[in-house]
């Protein structure tokens, strides 16, 4: 029998998801009588390969196989498979074998599948079809019989290995739906030792545990007499679940699964399952790194189902121009009475939806614990009814012009002073919209002002008894301050929100007020109730609703993910100006009521874009969201939206397929840094081969309003030439890829593969083999979801026409049709623009790359040519404009390195740079003489690294910080900057040093974001290990980018030895961390000693070159970074 592929990573992935993973022969050997042979002499090679490559996976909780199986065949293979598929469809089970099959219904009739009575096939399933017609599977049926094969197909999961390292799933629940069992934690390999830093061997730096502060450790010791890390003492009786405590008459608001004992701590922490031996990195004292104890519940509309994390995305982009609380706001909808307090308690803690006025309500008994809470929550409702929200808003977030009249700038910053009749200051009539726009853009409230407003509201609203103590109030307000200072994609973890909150101070949590001894289960119950109250007040019910009611919160184009808070009265004026400017630049036609009605009734449904604006330094950028259906108040989760979005993704995949098959369609378009590197390297080597090297002329052109200016008729002609709707038919396969990362995490990706009948791979084995040959697919499991073998080009082209000609934009309650350009919020926008400009280049600039190079990143052109007349003609053509393609140069962003005659381009002239300079283009700096490339860091000036860098802190923030830093480092180590055939050694030294210096800024930003006030001095070895891993990772990427070159040798010699990379890394981190010596004093000594040790190892010439690359004058851009 042939040997099975090893596929170690795939086998390890499956073992982490199933109870048992066995070869097919081993599994069957356990069922059959001794001596029964599955593979016999003379069996076909296909059957031998099937037995060798098939893995049987037994799910957790699967029904056991028949006790005495009958190895007799009764049915043919097609009949047996059909019978299994019908049973799966009747059970409603998700099984790969039944993908593409469904039960017949009245609306969707048709003949049933052969050998079934009520199953139809609506999409081809190539895995099932291959199995039904396979001779090898037929022979397997004859050897094992109906009972055993039915059990394998219906109750187990089968995988077939595909050499060299992948597999695909044949049957069973799809692998991407399975979660790892809690009893089998995924192993995480330790951090390897790295030479170069003293005291950072495998033992010193391998632990990434950010230990708790001494104060928290001492408080934990005071809480319990046992050892700090031990579990709760075993109870004499089996501990009851939370649902079985005395309040069992109420709904189970916090159901708990059976879990091992967890340690009890004085801080509020979610009770979660954790292995006593499992360690975590960066967590607070006394917490565990898994999910909260409660499960999602069917709560009311105003309260989210999963209150685990307050997230900043919940208060972004809230429309509306009035600064007021909506009547549907939960606290406003309830009267300040005991009955209203009861409803509020039920809504917060028991997941009950508030009843509409007049609706019949079935009263139920409220548990005693919650009954005693009513007076406090009645006081809260009364405080809310009396709270002067508008006055507090005017006091703490005054409009800047009005605040300047009443007090100093410091008072305005602190939120001092009252503006009783506050209105945004109107600009004089003679001021233009642009001037007024800039003034209004500056009238955003600082996070401190917003926090002062929220603090005043919370102090007015929440009774003292609910806080329990001033300590708890200060802790919660500190978390509110941190919450509004987070970036766009950040969230505040439940552990942070409840850290150091004292349960014993909150008497309203007590189930039995007279009890002097609190059992561990009761203490955890109190923790959960307080945690739920804090999460809902901070993240869902109150703080987020206040922000949504009084502010428009958005990110900007110039401050990365940092959030800006505009009062709605200011934002409404900004939005009005933005809409007027949009009408001036984009051709929109308003729809009549009849047209709107026709679009709503159209079949298939049409997407409608919602417009929002993104602030720029001196303007607004329109952004559209295409996740809406015309006439339906539904978001992207709606089935209609999902179907239309799926069609758009299919169209996108088809266009990409044609682009890959015919690269000339894109012209000079570059799809990323890798494409730029390949094109630039080819050009550089060609120029350097000439002797003497010619003088080169550079032209950079940015197109004005590229997406909005594309003529739709021309775009339709271009796409018709790409798709060829009357000729083309495509085969589209939807599949999922599941892989296991080096750290034990499972990564899932859902993809589409497009082909034609000429290059179709109909069988999954061939398809997986092709993926491994043509892509970087390794150590993965592939699951086919569906396959369409007849995607007509005409239907895809018709979808494209609907997208272009029927794009509806909702602006201010009215609907408009976009008559020019393409929607910017679509996944197709960039590709359509590139295809259109590629067609323009073929028509207008043939042969322009004969001696030079033309590059374009979407709408940013770069021409480098040795011919001055060619450069002038190219510049003149784009400045004059190409109306057939809507292409016109923006002279403010156009630059050349040669003189332009006065009047040659009209009244305006582009930026003229010296003949020899660092020429900027798309974040790159190109040396016009040597053609070496470095990165342009000017975009980081006056920005906050903290605002642009967020990492999922989760249960292991230390490990997540390290993973995030290394992931960003890999992105920045582009081949264009590290290629020694393009750049000289000094330029590569300088590029590597700047990468390390920016990484040091990121390191500092991450340390500032670590939760629980974790000081660096508590675990310096971990942070030193992160710095050492930074140098190691960058040097590995440097070697990969220069494969075939010998970079280093013994004795720190060679072109670029590893010691040089570590020296640059240490120098960069010392430069940054020395400015924060109070935080990093424990690291500076080790870093300085390691740098001195490397300085003694490096040759003098290499050391002098490194010091020149690290000259402070070369890193002036970094001095203006805000962090």
From Swiss-Prot:
Residues 202-311 are annotated as: Disordered. It is found in: Nucleus, Nucleolus; Nucleus, Nucleoplasm; Nucleus; Chromosome, Telomere. Residues 905-919 are annotated as: Required for oligomerization. Mg(2+) binds at residues 702, 859-860. Residues 137-141 are annotated as: Required for regulating specificity for telomeric DNA and for processivity for primer elongation. Residues 921-925 are annotated as: Primer grip sequence. The record marks 169 as: Required for optimal binding of telomeric ssDNA and incorporation of nucleotides at the second position of the template. The keyword Metal-binding applies. A motif (Bipartite nuclear localization signal) lies at residues 222-240. It catalyses: DNA(n) + a 2'-deoxyribonucleoside 5'-triphosphate = DNA(n+1) + diphosphate. Residues 927-1123 are annotated as: CTE. The modification Phosphoserine is found at residues 227, 446. Its EC number is 2.7.7.49. Residues 381-401 are annotated as: CP motif. One of its GO terms (cellular component) is cytoplasm. Residues 260-279 have a biased composition (Low complexity). The primer grip sequence in the RT domain is required for telomerase activity and for stable association with short telomeric primers. The RNA-interacting domain 1 (RD1)/N-terminal extension (NTE) is required for interaction with the pseudoknot-template domain of each of TERC dimers. It contains anchor sites that bind primer nucleotides upstream of the RNA-DNA hybrid and is thus an essential determinant of repeat addition processivity. Belongs to the reverse transcriptase family. Telomerase subfamily. Telomerase is a ribonucleoprotein enzyme essential for the replication of chromosome termini in most eukaryotes. Active in progenitor and cancer cells. Inactive, or very low activity, in normal somatic cells. Catalytic component of the teleromerase holoenzyme complex whose main activity is the elongation of telomeres by acting as a reverse transcriptase that adds simple sequence repeats to chromosome ends by copying a template sequence within the RNA component of the enzyme. This is Telomerase reverse transcriptase. It comes from Canis lupus familiaris.
């Amino acid at each position: 029998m042939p040997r099975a592929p090893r596929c170690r990573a795939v086998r390890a992935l499956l073992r982490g998801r199933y109870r048992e993973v066995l070869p097919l022969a081993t599994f069957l050997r356990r069922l059959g009588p001794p001596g029964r042979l599955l593979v016999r002499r003379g069996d076909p090679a296909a059957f031998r390969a099937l037995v060798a490559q098939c893995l049987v996976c037994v799910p957790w909780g699967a029904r056991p196989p028949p006790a005495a199986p009958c190895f007799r065949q009764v049915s043919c293979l097609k009949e047996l498979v059909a019978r299994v598929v019908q049973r799966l469809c009747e059970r409603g089970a998700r099984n790969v074998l039944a993908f593409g099959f469904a039960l017949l219904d009245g609306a969707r009739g048709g003949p049933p599948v052969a050998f079934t009575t009520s199953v139809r096939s609506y999409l081809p399933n190539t895995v099932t079809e291959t199995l039904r017609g396979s001779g090898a599977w037929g022979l397997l049926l004859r050897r094992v019989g109906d009972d055993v094969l039915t059990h394998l197909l219906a109750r187990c999961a089968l995988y077939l290995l595909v050499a060299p390292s992948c597999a695909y799933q044949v049957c069973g629940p799809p692998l991407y739906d399975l979660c790892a069992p809690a009893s089998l934690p995924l192993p995480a390999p330790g951090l390897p030792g790295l030479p170069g830093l003293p005291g950072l061997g495998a033992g010193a730096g391998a632990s990434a545990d950010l230990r708790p502060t001494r104060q928290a450790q001492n408080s934990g010791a005071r809480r319990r007499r046992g050892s700090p890390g031990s579990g709760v003492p075993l109870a004499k009786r089996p501990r009851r679940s939370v649902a079985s405590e005395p309040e069992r008459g109420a709904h189970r608001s916090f159901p708990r699964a059976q879990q091992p004992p967890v340690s009890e701590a004085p801080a509020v922490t979610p009770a979660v399952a954790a292995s006593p031996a499992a360690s975590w990195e960066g967590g607070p004292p006394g917490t565990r790194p898994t999910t909260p104890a409660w499960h999602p519940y069917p709560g009311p509309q105003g309260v989210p189902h999963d209150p685990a994390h307050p997230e900043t995305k919940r208060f972004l982009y809230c429309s509306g121009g009035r600064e007021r609380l909506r009547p549907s706001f939960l606290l406003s909808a309830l009267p300040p009475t005991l009955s209203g307090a009861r409803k509020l308690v039920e809504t917060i803690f028991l997941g009950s939806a508030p009843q509409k006025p007049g609706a019949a309500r079935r009263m139920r008994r409220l548990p005693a614990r919650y009954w005693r809470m009513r007076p406090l929550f009645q006081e809260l409702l009364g405080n809310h009814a009396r709270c002067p929200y508008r006055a507090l808003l005017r006091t703490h977030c005054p409009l800047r012009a009005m605040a300047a009249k009443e007090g100093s700038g410091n008072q305005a910053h602190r939120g001092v002073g009252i503006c009783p009749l506050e209105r945004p200051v109107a600009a004089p009539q003679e001021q233009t919209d642009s001037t007024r726009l800039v003034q209004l853009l500056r009238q955003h409230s600082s996070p401190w002002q917003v926090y002062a407003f929220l603090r005043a509201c919370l102090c007015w609203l929440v009774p003292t008894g609910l806080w329990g103590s001033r300590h708890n109030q200060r802790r919660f307000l500190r978390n509110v301050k941190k919450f509004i200072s987070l970036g766009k994609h950040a969230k505040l973890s439940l552990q942070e929100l409840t850290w150091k909150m004292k349960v014993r101070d909150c008497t309203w949590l007590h189930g039995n007020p007279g009890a002097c001894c609190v059992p561990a289960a009761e203490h955890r119950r109190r923790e959960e109730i307080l945690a739920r109250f804090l999460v809902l007040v901070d993240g869902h019910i109150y703080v987020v609703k206040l922000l949504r009611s009084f502010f428009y919160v958005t990110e900007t184009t110039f401050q990365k993910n940092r959030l800006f808070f505009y009062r709605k009265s200011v934002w409404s004026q900004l939005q009005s100006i933005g809409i007027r400017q949009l009408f001036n630049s984009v051709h929109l036609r308003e729809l009549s009521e009849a047209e709107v009605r026709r679009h709503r009734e159209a079949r298939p449904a049409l997407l409608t874009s919602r417009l929002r604006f993104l602030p720029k330094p001196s303007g607004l950028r329109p952004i559209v969201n295409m996740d809406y259906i015309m006439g339906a108040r539904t978001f992207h989760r709606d089935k209609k939206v999902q179907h239309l979005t799926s069609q758009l993704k299919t169209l996108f995949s088809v266009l990409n397929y044609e682009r890959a098959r015919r690269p000339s369609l894109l012209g000079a378009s570059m799809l990323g840094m890798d494409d730029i590197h390949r094109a630039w390297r080819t050009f550089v080597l060609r120029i350097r081969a000439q002797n003497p090297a010619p003088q080169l002329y550079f032209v950079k052109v940015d197109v004005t309003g590229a997406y909005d200016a594309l003529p739709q008729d021309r775009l339709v002609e271009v796409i018709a030439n790409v798709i060829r709707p009357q000729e083309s038919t495509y085969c589209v396969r939807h599949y999922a890829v599941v892989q296991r990362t080096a750290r034990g995490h499972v990564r899932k990706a859902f993809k589409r593969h497009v082909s034609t009948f000429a290059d179709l791979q109909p069988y999954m084995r061939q398809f997986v083999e092709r993926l491994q040959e043509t892509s970087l697919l390794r150590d993965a499991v592939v699951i086919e979801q569906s396959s369409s073998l007849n995607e007509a080009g005409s239907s895809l082209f018709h979808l494209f026409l609907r997208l272009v000609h029927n794009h509806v934009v909702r602006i201010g309650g009215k609907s408009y049709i976009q008559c020019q350009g393409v929607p910017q919020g679509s996944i197709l926008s960039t590709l359509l623009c590139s295809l259109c400009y590629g067609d323009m280049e073929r028509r207008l600039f043939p042969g322009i790359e004969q001696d030079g190079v033309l590059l374009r990143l979407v709408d940013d052109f770069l021409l480098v040519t040795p011919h001055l007349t060619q450069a002038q003609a190219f510049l003149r053509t784009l400045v004059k404009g190409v109306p057939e393609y809507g292409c016109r140069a923006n002279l403010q962003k156009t630059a050349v390195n040669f003189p332009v005659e006065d009047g040659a381009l009209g009244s305006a002239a582009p930026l003229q740079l010296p003949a020899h300079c660092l020429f900027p283009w798309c974040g790159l700096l190109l040396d016009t003489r040597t053609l070496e490339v470095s990165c342009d860091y000017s975009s980081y000036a006056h920005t906050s690294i903290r605002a642009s860098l967020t990492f999922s802190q989760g249960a292991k923030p230390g490990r997540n910080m390290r993973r995030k830093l290394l992931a960003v480092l890999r992105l920045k180590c582009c081949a264009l900057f590290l290629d020694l055939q393009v750049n000289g050694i000094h330029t590569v030294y300088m590029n590597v040093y700047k990468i390390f210096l920016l990484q040091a800024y990121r390191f500092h930003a991450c340390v500032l974001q670590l939760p629980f006030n974790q000081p660096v001095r508590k675990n310096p070895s971990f942070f030193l290990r992160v710095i050492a891993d930074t140098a190691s990772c960058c040097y590995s990427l440097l070697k990969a980018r220069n494969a075939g070159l010998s970079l280093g040798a013994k004795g720190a010699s060679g072109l670029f030895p590893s010691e040089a990379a570590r020296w640059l890394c240490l120098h960069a981190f010392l430069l940054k961390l020395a400015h924060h010596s109070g935080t990093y004093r424990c690291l500076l000594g080790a870093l300085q000693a390691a740098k001195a040790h490397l300085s003694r190892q490096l040759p003098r010439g290499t050391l002098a070159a490194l010091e020149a690359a690290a000259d402070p004058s070369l890193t002036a851009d970094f001095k203006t970074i805000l962090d």
